[in-house]
Amino acid sequence: MASSSLHFFFFLTLLLPFTFTTATRDTCATAAPDGSDDLSIIPINAKCSPFAPTHVSASVIDTVLHMASSDSHRLTYLSSLVAGKPKPTSVPVASGNQLHIGNYVVRAKLGTPPQLMFMVLDTSNDAVWLPCSGCSGCSNASTSFNTNSSSTYSTVSCSTAQCTQARGLTCPSSSPQPSVCSFNQSYGGDSSFSASLVQDTLTLAPDVIPNFSFGCINSASGNSLPPQGLMGLGRGPMSLVSQTTSLYSGVFSYCLPSFRSFYFSGSLKLGLLGQPKSIRYTPLLRNPRRPSLYYVNLTGVSVGSVQVPVDPVYLTFDANSGAGTIIDSGTVITRFAQPVYEAIRDEFRKQVNVSSFSTLGAFDTCFSADNENVAPKITLHMTSLDLKLPMENTLIHSSAGTLTCLSMAGIRQNANAVLNVIANLQQQNLRILFDVPNSRIGIAPEPCN
C-alpha cells in the first residue's frame, strides 16, 4: 500500500541547467536539506546529474539556444502525435549517443532495494520508461535500471489486459507459453526503442507504490532519449498521473524556475494538498486522437494594449487536424503557427519602434538593450483566463547584454503549422496546475526560486 493518504503531495526540487561553481550546502543529497519528504529534482546538465557535460556555458542565452536546438525534434514529435490517427510506432523514444531532449529531471527510486533514477518530466507523454540492464544502444550501462538486483521486479504477460494499453505491441498472435508483453515505439522525432512492459516498486519521497508499470528498454537508436528514461505526466492509462490516481487524485502542478540564475529551484506537487487556492482556471480540451496532450483554448494574443489580428483558423481547436494550442514542458521556446507569430512580431516591432532588428539563433527580433524599457508585454487570451507574461518570460538578453530579443518563434513550415506550443521558457515563475478529473488547468504567478 502507498504510505501516504490520498491528499499527500510532494515537493520536487527543480534546478536550472547550468554549471555550479560554489554551493552553501550539499545540493546533491538524496534527501531534502530541511529534512522534509521532498523528492529532489535536478537539472540534467547540473553538477548533481550523472549526465552533466564537462563544460557548460553559464550564459543564459547560450544555454537557452542550446536547449532550443532540440525544439525542432520536439515539434516533429508533437506533430506526429496529432497528425491523423497515431501509428503503432508513434510514441516514446530512446537514444544511444547524445542527449537532445529533456530540461528538468526528477529523482525517483525503483526496485527493492531502491535504485536511484533520474527521469525527465514530460507533460505531453503518457508513458513511463527507462533503459534496463543489457540494453543495446543505450547511452551508458551504468545509468540503467538493474532488473536482476530487484526482488520485486516482474514482467507483464501478453495475455493481460494491461498489455493491450501499450502502443506498438509486438506480442505473437499465438504462443504455447505466456509471452512477455513487448512493444516498439518512437519519440522525439528521430529515435525509437523496443521494450518490455514490466512492474516494480516505485518510491516517490515517502510514498511506496507497488506494482508500478513501466517500459523496460531493451534496445534503442536515435538521439532523443533521456539517459535514464522518462516520466510521462499525460492523461493516458500508463502515465504516472493515471497509475497513481488513487493516491494523488489526478492533480499535479509545477513551478519552473527562471533561466537567470545558477541556483534557482522550483517544485512539482502531486495531489490535492498544498495546491494554490487563489488561482484562475481555463478548461482543458481533449483530443481523442491524442488524449495525453494538454490542449487549451487560445482565443487571441495581445501585444501591449493591441489585440493582434489573427485568422481564427490558426487558433481554433480541431481534433482531426491537430490544430490548437498545447501546454508542453519539453519544448523550450513558445512556438506559434507562422501567421500568428508574424502578427505578434510585427506589432511588437511596431511598438518598440527602433530603426532595425537583428537575428540571434532562433530569435528574429533582437534590438539594442537600451530600448528594452519600451518593449510591450504580451498577453495570451484563453477561455476565462488572460495570461500576461512577465517581461522575463518575453525577452532574453545576449551574452554581452547589448541585445534584447523577443523570446518566441514561428513554427517551421515542414512541421505541423497549425499546432501552437506554450513552452517552458514562457511558463517560468508561474504555478501551472493540472486538474485532470475536472478537465481544467490553473495558472498563477509564483516566484519559483
UniProtKB/Swiss-Prot annotation:
Domain of life: Eukaryota
Active-site residues (renumbered): D122, D328
Protein EC: 3.4.23.-
GO BP terms: proteolysis; regulation of programmed cell death; systemic acquired resistance
Molecular function terms from GO: aspartic-type endopeptidase activity; nucleotide binding
Keyword Protease: yes
Gene Ontology cellular component terms for the protein in this record: apoplast; secretory vesicle
Residue ranges constituting the Peptidase A1 domain according to the UniProt record: 104-444
Keywords assigned: Apoplast, Aspartyl protease, Disulfide bond, Glycoprotein, Hydrolase, Nucleotide-binding, Protease, Secreted, Signal
UniProt KW Disulfide bond keyword: yes
Covalent S-S links between cysteines: C132-C138, C366-C405
Signal peptide: 1-23
InterPro entries, sorted: Aspartic_peptidase_A1, PEPTIDASE_A1, Peptidase_aspartic_dom_sf, TAXi_C, TAXi_N
Cellular localisation: Secreted, Extracellular space, Apoplast
Residue positions the entry lists as glycosylated: N140, N148, N184, N211, N297, N353
Family per similarity comment: Belongs to the peptidase A1 family.
PANTHER family in UniProt: ASPARTYL PROTEASE AED3-LIKE, ASPARTYL PROTEASES
Record's protein name: Aspartyl protease AED3
Species of origin: Arabidopsis thaliana (Mouse-ear cress)
Lineage: Eukaryota, Viridiplantae, Streptophyta, Embryophyta, Tracheophyta
